[in-house]
Amino acid sequence: MMMGKEDLGLSLSLGFSQNHNPLQMNLNPNSSLSNNLQRLPWNQTFDPTSDLRKIDVNSFPSTVNCEEDTGVSSPNSTISSTISGKRSEREGISGTGVGSGDDHDEITPDRGYSRGTSDEEEDGGETSRKKLRLSKDQSAFLEETFKEHNTLNPKQKLALAKKLNLTARQVEVWFQNRRARTKLKQTEVDCEYLKRCVEKLTEENRRLQKEAMELRTLKLSPQFYGQMTPPTTLIMCPSCERVGGPSSSNHHHNHRPVSINPWVACAGQVAHGLNFEALRPRS
């Protein structure tokens, strides 16, 4: 049986693992097979009772053949089964590791350590952001200095910091904040003043608009022309009035209106006077 398989030179191996891996077939022709095929004629038929069996590669092998072949399987099938077994063991270990709580216990200290570090950093940031506490004497002295000079040069900063037992940076920050507060207060005062000016100008604008509307109404009304003063009148002197004759009116003799053209009136009065002189008798 074994010799017949060696002559045939075909080794069929089917490895079945626990994980039902796909069928693996190893067809390796040997040199003896090529020699035997060269010796045999092509029209020769094989005896089915002989030791040499026909193997149809395209058909699925029977159970008996599989059982016989598994006993003489190639080393590749052994290696594949070993690899599949290791793979199953590895999967089982990984599955138990995921479900266990040991990993969570190992991560927890790291998280706690990271939280502790962040808490320490936050505490350090809070201490660095603490406000400067000044005494009443220090505040009063700084206010007096600010009234004299709202800005300081480096020498003045060092001298003031040494005198008040502070650092130059603290003095500089205090002056910056004080200037900012002063500017803010001045801005608020200017804003209030501008608001009052705007309100006053708004009222004045409303008053002027009202007066302009009243003037337009009077200009368009017809009574405006009736209330106008009469045109210019001439006043005659008493002597001319006596020469001209008695007035038809008994009152307002001194304010009798005459013609608008003064030259015509004067010419008539002169001519009238000359007539009287001509009629006067000569002595």
Swiss-Prot record:
Region span, Leucine-zipper: 194-215
Induction text: By indole-3-acetic acid (IAA).
Binding region for DNA: 127-186
Positions of region (Disordered): 64-134
PROSITE patterns: HOMEOBOX_1, HOMEOBOX_2
Matching Pfam families: HALZ (PF02183), HD-ZIP_N (PF04618), Homeodomain (PF00046)
GO CC list: nucleus
GO biological process, one term: unidimensional cell growth
SUPFAM superfamilies listed in its UniProt record: Homeodomain-like
Subunit structure: Interacts with RBR1.
PANTHER family in UniProt: HOMEOBOX-LEUCINE ZIPPER PROTEIN HAT14, HOMEOBOX-LEUCINE ZIPPER PROTEIN HAT2
Protein's name in the database: Homeobox-leucine zipper protein HAT2
Protein source organism: Arabidopsis thaliana (Mouse-ear cress)
